[in-house]
């Protein structure tokens, strides 16, 4: 009931969008975003017999960049067998997706190679109009253009909070509806908190450790670079020693921290 009520108001405002800007609707869950965008908005627009221009938008790293993806699979030497198996569902999914939202591709996430996503998702600095238009483009740029033609913009709380912190991503708007508002404070806490722990730091170090399985891809790239610039492999070995020493120092530091504070916070 309440969903239709605020969407009714949003659609009534659509005739004044040039003067007042679009209506932004923020949700906490992907389920509600999908329900609003794919079911409720079309149903209400048909009932009211009014045209609707709506866009559903998420954070940039949720969208695949076809340029980066093409470049990654073009050089098979940088991928191991498990990497290629994980990317097969993505290749099939690209033939039918209209949004480029990688969360649609459950086969990729079932592969447990989710760190590969950072190698093909849309990225600031890389995904420019000049590069992406030359290589069949990427979905994120198309969505950004559609934002400025939309009457209604459906976002998640994370994106709304990003806009509040660093304005300019969304077009100017004067009306915002926050659905699932009881989750807004929690979303803000998760977004703006600064967190540090041993597990997270160790995981980051593993990403640059040449001896770790997650480093196989860039190890293969270094092997190719070494053929052109001998000596690079020696630097890799030095990095491996440095990471090992840092991991040891991290464990010692965290143990000392626990010893000094365990009785203070756990009497």
PLM regions: where:
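A substrate-engagement module of RecA-like helicase motors
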Residues: 17-151, 215, 219-226
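Residue-level marker of positions within ordered structural domains that often coincide
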Residues: 11-12, 62
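Conserved P-loop NTPase motor core
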Residues: 8-9, 49
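Conserved lysine of the Walker
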Residues: 2-3
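Signature of the SF2 helicase/ATPase Hel1-core->accessory helical subdomain module
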Residues: 6, 12, 34, 39-42, ...
């Amino acid at each position: 009931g309440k969903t239709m009520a605020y969407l009714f108001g949003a659609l009534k405002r659509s005739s004044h969008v040039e003067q007042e800007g679009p209506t932004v609707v923020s949700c906490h869950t992907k389920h509600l975003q999908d329900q609003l965008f794919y079911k409720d908005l079309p149903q209400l627009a048909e009932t009211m017999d009014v045209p609707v221009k709506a866009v559903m938008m998420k954070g940039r790293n949720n969208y695949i960049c076809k340029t980066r993806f093409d470049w990654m699979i073009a050089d098979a030497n940088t991928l191991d067998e498990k990497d290629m198996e994980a990317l097969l569902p993505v290749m099939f999914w690209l033939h039918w997706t209209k949004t480029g939202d990688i969360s649609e591709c459950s086969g990729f996430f079932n592969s447990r190679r989710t760190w590969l996503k950072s190698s093909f998702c849309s990225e600031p600095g890389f995904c420019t109009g000049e590069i992406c238009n030359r290589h069949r483009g990427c979905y994120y740029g198309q969505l950004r253009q559609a934002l400025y033609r939309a009457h209604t913009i459906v976002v998640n709380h994370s994106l709304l909070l990003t806009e509040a912190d660093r304005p300019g991503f969304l077009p100017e708007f004067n009306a915002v509806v926050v659905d699932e508002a009881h989750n807004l404070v929690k979303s803000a806490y998760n977004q703006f908190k600064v967190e540090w722990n041993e597990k997270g730091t160790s995981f980051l170090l593993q990403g640059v450790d040449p001896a770790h399985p997650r480093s196989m891809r860039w190890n293969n790239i270094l092997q190719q670079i070494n053929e052109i610039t001998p000596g690079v492999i020696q630097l890799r070995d030095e990095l491996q020693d440095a990471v090992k020493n840092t991991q040891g120092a991290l464990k010692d530091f965290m143990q000392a921290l626990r010893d000094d504070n365990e009785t203070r916070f756990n009497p």
